[in-house]
Amino acid sequence: PIALIDEQMPIVVIAVNSNHYDKVVSNIQEIKSRKGKIIAVVTEGDTVVKELADYIMEVPNTPETLSPLVTTIPLQLLSYHIALMLGRNVDQPRNLAKAVTVE
């Protein structure tokens, strides 16, 4: 919820070229007005979001239908590195059970 946003709250935003880009930029401006820290995944060469965000990860310009595939990679890398920084075991997550089904 937007009421929880403050200078201690990092917000991850996907702001690639799409039909919703202007709305995403508007949301980023709202987050910025509440002093939120913005981590943005943007299309290469984007200058608008680059000015607003605290941290950016650039992805190649791709058709809108393929952008979920391209933006997933930096988000997975972000979560991986955050887990390492927090000392989590990324190779053996807790509560993960292997299931083998034999018919």
Across the structure, where does each feature detected by a protein language model lie?
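A SIS-like phosphosugar-recognition module
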Residues: P1-E103
